[in-house]
């Protein structure tokens, strides 16, 4: 494996770790406060449940994106570069949306750093090498 590929995998792993940390903070630290605030608000009760669900789904979304990026980066597949870049793009869109609707805060700073790590890691990934022909003699 090339040094470039090793660096790419490290960057993708770091980006995924940031997404895991973001999901943990979002789901474990922020959700209880949001849930309490929703209960105390005058928001229609029919909207409180869906908002709680969406809040938790966002954390799950980051976990799923991180897992897909890790699997793609550490598996020799033809699509790994595209998959990691797509994961980075997905987080970039979420970062832009949080900036537009909420403004600058720790959450979108974490998402932004995960985006950069995933995108740079994805760009550095080599395309998967072709599997060696089973009939060809080995070079050992």
Regions found by a protein language model. Name each.
Residues 2-8, 39-46, 76:
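Helix-boundary and loop/linker segments of multi-pass membrane transporters
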Residues 4-20, 80-88:
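Interfacial segments of alpha-helical transmembrane regions
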Residues 64, 108-117:
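Membrane-embedded alpha-helical segments of multi-pass membrane proteins
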Residues 3-5, 64-83, 128:
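Juxtamembrane helix-break-helix junctions at the cytosolic face
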Residues 17, 21-33, 43-74, 86-93:
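Core segments of alpha-helical transmembrane spans in multipass integral membrane proteins
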Residues 115-125:
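Alpha-helical transmembrane segments and their membrane-interface exit regions
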Residues 78, 85, 89-111, 124-132:
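Membrane-helix boundary connector in multi-pass membrane proteins
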Residues 2-3, 128-140:
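Short, charged juxtamembrane terminal tails flanking transmembrane helices
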């Amino acid at each position: 494996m090339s040094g470039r590929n090793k660096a790419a995998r490290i960057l993708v792993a770091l980006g995924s770790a940031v997404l895991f940390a973001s999901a943990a903070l979002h789901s474990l630290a922020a959700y209880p406060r949001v849930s309490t605030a929703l209960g105390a608000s005058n928001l229609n009760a029919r909207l409180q449940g869906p908002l709680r669900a969406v809040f938790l789904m966002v954390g799950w979304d980051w976990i799923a994106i991180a897992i897909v990026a890790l699997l793609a980066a550490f598996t020799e597949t033809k699509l790994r570069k595209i998959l990691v870049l797509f994961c980075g793009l997905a987080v970039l869109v979420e970062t832009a949306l949080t900036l537009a609707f909420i403004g600058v805060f720790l959450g979108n700073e974490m998402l932004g750093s995960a985006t950069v790590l995933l995108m740079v890691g994805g760009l550095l990934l080599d395309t998967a090498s072709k599997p060696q022909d089973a009939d060809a003699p080995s070079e050992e």
